[in-house]
Structures are given as C-alpha cells and as structure tokens.
C-alpha cells in the first residue's frame, strides 16, 4: 500500500516511517522540517518539504497517490500553546483541516491521526482513563488536538472515509529532541550524560504514562493494516510513573548521584495521567511490549552514541 505520513521527518513520525517500510509499504513523507530532520528520512522514501497550510499541498498529495494518510505532524509543545495559542491552532487545527480537504479532493478514504492522550482528558480521577471519559483539556494544545479529532470525524461522516484517532500517552525514545519541552526523558538523558543539572517542574510527584516510540509505531502500523477500524483508541502502557521516579532511574543508568533541582510547576499541566489501552488491544491486537526499564536503557544508549558521534 502507498502511505503518506505527515511529520515523517520528526521524532514519532520517523519511527512510524521505519515500521511501515519494514512492513513492505511504499511511503511518502510531508514535513516542513521546522522540527523534523531530513537525515531521518530513508532513501527509499520520497520527502516532500511542504507545510500543511501551503497551497502546494494538493499537488503533493496528488503526486503521492496514497491509499492511507497517517497524520502525525503537529505543534506539540504545551508551553508554546499557552504562550501563542493562535500559532498552535493554526498548525494543529487549520493544518489538519487543510489536509482533510485535500484528502477529500484526492479521494483518500483512510486517515489515521495521532492525537494526545493526557492533554485531552486533563485532570481526572478515573485512572487509567478510557476513551469515553469526558475531554477536559487544560491547555490550548489539548484543545487544538481534540478539536482536530472532531474535524476528522466530520470528514469521515461527509466523505464516507474511515478515520481512526490514536490518543498517545507520553512517547519517548531515540531521536527525541532534548532541546524541546515535550520530552522529559530526552531532556534528562541528555543533561545527565553531559554532566548538567536537571530541572523538575513542581514537586515532581506528577505522573505520566510513558510509552516507547517503537510501540507507538507498531500501533500505527496495525491501524494501517486494519482499514475498517474507526473511532478512537488510547495508546499507552497503563502504568503511572512520577517525574521524580523517572529521574532516579535515569540517574542510576547514567551513574549520576546528583539530586534534581526543582522549579515552579508549568501552567496548563495536569497532575496525573495514565491511559487505559484496552480498546487498542480489542480493535488492533495491540499492547505495549517495551518495559520502562528497557526503554530507558535503549534511550540512554542512543544518547550516549549521539554524544560520541
């Protein structure tokens, strides 16, 4: 099958591309390279350097002729969404609308969308949180990603297409940007290996559900291989880990005895987040297979190799 991946030069998108290629699919990538890297795109893949809001998008999709579109491209920083909600909405909402309109004109019948899990549900006492829990996003990022979900549902209803939203937990692994604010594991790994202090926002007892990048790529690949599966499915491990515990594990792996520093909590960030992925197992046969300890070891090893390069 021909698959078009938006954001395929980025952290999550590049892992998705690798998995789709391994499964034998022909892959095209759209990426504006704002945060993605050209060198992450394999030679067997056609890279179209294009923003989803660009007028050239019609021609790019027409050239790719995809049977399925996997929409990963996004503005993913919560803090930037708080500082500049208009930009966040422009990328995550208007960019998605533009893509869906082009898909409609090109006759694309299948879209798989990677949305957010924790930022969608906000603070909740129902943990792990299932898909039918009310959406209570506490940040513009959560609002924009869940709004895009609604447009995807509308596109499917109007065109007869099949749309599947995967609400991702906190994704981590090789290739994550340690200079960004969305990946605490990448940030801690990079700084610990460099001998720099690490800053924990708030008291560090906030929890997250950390899911390894290859597990996420596997979920997307299963979605591509299951064209009749529609709706929404959480992609997470079902396990909560505090930021303090995360730091302790990474400090042990890197041989660092220094304690983390603490700063103020970030606006728009929820206290606890962990996803119920029962539906993903039922619909896609998917469960996370990489444990946190294994994933952290692989991630630290990758950052060590990057430092040597």
Language model features: what each stretch is:
Residues 35, 174, 237:
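Short, conserved catalytic or interaction motifs in soluble domains
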Residues 1-171, 214:
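N-terminal Rossmann-like NAD(P)+-binding domain of SDR-like oxidoreductases, especially those catalyzing
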Residues 190-309:
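C-terminal substrate-binding subdomain of Rossmann-fold SDR/epimerase-dehydratase oxidoreductases
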Residues 41, 53, 177-181, 239, ...:
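Residue-level signature of the cytosolic catalytic core of signaling kinases
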